[in-house]
Design a protein with these regions (language model features):
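Active-site neighborhood of divalent metal-dependent phosphoester/pyrophosphate hydrolases
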Residues: 1-103, 162-171, 192-205
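Autoprocessing Asn-cyclization modules and mimics
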Residues: 75, 82, 87-173
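Intrinsically disordered, low-complexity acidic/polar segments
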Residues: 116, 205-207
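Short beta-strand-initiation
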Residues: 150, 181-183
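Cys-His-centered catalytic/binding microenvironment captured across papain-like cysteine peptidases
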Residues: 174-180
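Short, surface-exposed beta-strand/loop micro-motifs that present aromatic residues
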Residues: 183-189
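His/acidic metal-ligating clusters that form di-metal
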Residues: 209-216
Length: 216
């Protein structure tokens, strides 16, 4: 048997629920399983594949339970569906634990060498909600009960191998679960046709319904 939890589960325990959803849907969908056994397929995800109604996952400073679930949902999606997709940047979601200090913009993680991560080709940094209901698709959990440092952050500078500077200071001093998003887009070619697989959620700003011409 398994004596210890895999690192992914230790860092992002909510991912187990997402994995179980994929297993459940496939076990119940006999026709779907038959299709996949016989037809090669490509997939791309929208918010419903991560947790319903994710918006603003790249909106700097945004705080919302669903928004900061992006990387957990994306990692699980690649485990079950996206693993076969051609991608421009194969680097996975980076998820780990780090220390933040109230009033400081620095995030310190002694287990990660940030100089070896392609930060310029990765997404925004999320500090996770860290509640048992973080990935539950139920409006009653859309409250403010998550970790006080749980926001969408822009990485402004790699200070050294184990330290990042973020765009805004932490609210409280604590060890947090954080992740840095991946680039999930790709393309492939068949004869003279080129097909583009888009990532419509991973790097999306929050739309402004009052200013529909706003860039971003």
């Amino acid at each position: 048997g398994q004596d210890t939890l895999p690192p992914t589960v230790k860092t992002m325990p909510s991912i187990v629920g997402v994995w179980e959803n994929y297993k459940l849907y496939l076990s119940r969908g006999n026709e779907l399983a038959q299709w996949h056994r016989n037809v090669p397929s490509y997939f791309t995800f929208d918010d419903h594949e991560l947790v319903n109604d994710i918006w603003g996952s790249a909106e700097i400073g945004k705080r919302h339970r669903r928004t900061v679930f992006r990387d957990i949902g994306t990692r699980a999606w690649f485990d079950y569906l996206g693993w076969a997709n051609p991608v421009e940047h194969p680097r996975r979601v980076h998820a780990a634990r780090g220390k933040m200090t109230a009033g400081s913009k620095l995030l310190v993680d002694s287990s990660t060498d940030f100089t070896k991560l392609p930060i310029d080709r990765m997404g925004t940094l999320h500090v996770h909600w860290d509640t048992p209901e973080a990935g539950v698709n139920n409006l009653k959990f859309d409250n403010d009960d998550g970790h006080k440092n749980s926001y969408v952050y822009q990485i402004t500078k790699v200070i050294d191998a184990h330290t990042l500077e973020l765009h805004m200071p932490a609210k409280v001093s604590d060890e947090v679960t954080y992740s840095i998003g991946r680039s999930s887009f790709g393309k492939f070619r068949v004869a003279n046709c080129e097909f583009f697989l888009l990532d419509t959620r991973g790097s999306r700003d929050l739309h402004d319904v009052a200013n529909r011409g706003k860039e971003g």
